[in-house]
């Protein structure tokens, strides 16, 4: 997620609203095309993740996990080299391709989690999974800080803006060495099952299968709406603070880093306690309200540090909502189906985020960034009213 979270502070002033001619990835294009391309460049990552994750997971179950992890890290290295070159020469299509490759390689996250579970005792599985969750939330605020540290916001040289991508490529190259030489060749439980036929449309078929179950469908509707709305908020808010508040790249990076810190503490401290005390369904409903109210408040109360405060509330809200829904999803199915259900939820998240990010480009093009944020607030609040009351299975 560090690689994903550096994108918004960089693309807002180079694609959505270029600050100068030298930092324009679509020179001489219309304002509408700039914003549509901005949404497409953001949205392609989670959409590729949606299609890749089930396929990569199936390959790892049927063959071995280590080769796929190596391929994913190598692919991530190449994707950031490609994005760096595209940013250096201000070329949109190669940048878009690099984003797509990054999304495809991120589909290995589930394989990494499976590898950890294969090689740890049963009583420590929850602990190891929590490590992956914390790592993801750390990436949310490390990415923007990484971009802010490496880019001079006053520079008009494209090479300066490409440095974070080359830096990330170097990080992945360093990671690749211990993965190749020190990661055990085969996890303990890999290859235990009979090989199954690879299904290239597994993600879509899993979604269709879950949609046939009434309770899963009832939960998935607000889950999709809120995550799509938040994707729209993420992309629109980067443009809005640049235009309306005059933020430069470094200030946009700080803005999103604050959200990442809020997400980190929400996952680690507040969410488990709130869910335990009030129940996942209540927490999910009211976290959607928190997102809507914080977004409206940001549009109205712009003084001083208040936008940063509302950004923190927004990220806390989406973190609470996501974790609560995951808890509900896992309680709607039997223990034997929970792994499948959580993979479906992850796919739903990727698809919803991708649609929201792409939609933000359309809204910014024809209405403005303000409209994208209003869209987020309205649909987050709407989700409160349609959130279902569900009967969960007993925990085993």
Pin down the residues of each PLM region.
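Hydrophobic core of transmembrane alpha-helices in multi-pass small-molecule transporters
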Residues: 91-107, 306-320
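Helix-to-loop junctions at the C-terminal end of transmembrane segments
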Residues: 51-64, 266-280, 364
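Cytoplasmic helix-loop-helix junction between adjacent transmembrane helices
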Residues: 98-136
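Juxtamembrane intracellular "pre-TM" segments in multi-pass secondary transporters
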Residues: 187-221
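Short amphipathic helix-loop junctions that connect adjacent transmembrane helices
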Residues: 10-35, 235-251
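C-terminal ends and interior cores of transmembrane alpha-helices
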Residues: 74-89, 290-302
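Central cavity-lining transmembrane alpha-helices of secondary-active solute carriers
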Residues: 39-57, 257-269
